[in-house]
Amino acid sequence: MDFKEQIAAYAAQIGIDKIGFAQATQTWQKDKYEEYLRLGYSCGFENQDIVKRYALSTDDFTAATIIAVAIAFPPYQAPVNEYEARFCAASVGIDYHAVMNEKLNDLGEFLLKLVPGSQYKIAADTGNWSDREIAVLCGLGWIGKNSNLVTKDYGSFVYLGEIIWDVPLEAPLKLVEDHCLNCDLCVRACPMLAIDDKRRMVDTRRCLAYKTLDKNYPTEETIAKIAANGYIYGCDVCQLACPYNQWLDNDKHIFWQENRD
C-alpha cells in the first residue's frame, strides 16, 4: 500500500469515518470569503484576516499535504425539559474537540512512523482556516445551501478536523459533486430566514445558532423564535430538513453515547 492507503486504513482502525487528502497549494475560495465579509454575514467568530486564514505554513513549518477527517455523530435531540429547551446535537454529550484531537494526534503519530523526523500540526475548529473548506478540498463532501458540509454517507452530522503535514503526497483535486440541485428544504425550514442559498452562505447576524452563542442575543424576535423552536443553544432546524440527514446510522461510536442526558 502507498502512504495514503496506509493512512486511510489506520484512520478507519481508530474510528475515523471519512478521510481525504489535498496538496497544501490547492486553490481556496478566497474570493467567496471576501464576499462573505463584504456582505456583513460574519458573526465575528471567524478569523477575518484573509492572509492568516489561508496560510497553512509558518516560519518554522512548511505545509505540503492536508489530511481532512470526519467523524459521524447522531442527530440526537436531547429530551426537552419542562420548558422545552433544546441543545443542538453537536453540543450534546462529550466535548468533540477532545475526542477529535485525540484521534488526530494518534493519526499524527502514525505519520511520524511512516516518515520519521517529519512534522505535523492538527486543528479541529481551532485553526485560522475553515474546516469545511478544507474538507471540500479533500473530497469529503460538498457545501450545502445552508453552508454546512454535506457528505453522502453521514449527511452533515459530522465533526471535522485536519492534519497539516510537511510531507508531500500525490493528491490530485477530486471535488465531490454537488447533490443539492434544486432542493431548498433547508432554506424554507430556517426560522430566521438566514440562508442565502444562491451564495451558499448564512447571514450569521440572523442565524439562530449564532444568536444563541451571543451574550447580546435576546431580542424580542429571537426570543419568539426560540420559544417556537425550543433551541436555547445552537439550532439544527435546517440540518434536520436535509434529505441527506434522514435515516442516518451515525450512532456507532460509543464515545458519543456518553453523558448525553
Predicted regions: what is each one?
Residues M1-H179:
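Auxiliary alpha/beta "docking" domains used to position bulky ligands
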Residues L37-N47, N216-N229:
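Surface-exposed acidic, glycine/proline-enriched linker/cap segments
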Residues D166-A171, R188, T219-A224:
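Short Cys/His-rich Zn2+-coordinating modules
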Residues P172-L181, A224-C235:
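Immediate flanking context of iron-sulfur cluster ligation sites
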Residues L185-T219, A227-E258:
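Iron-sulfur cluster-binding cysteine motifs and their immediate structural context
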Residues D261:
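Conserved nucleotide- and phosphate/pyrophosphate-binding catalytic cores
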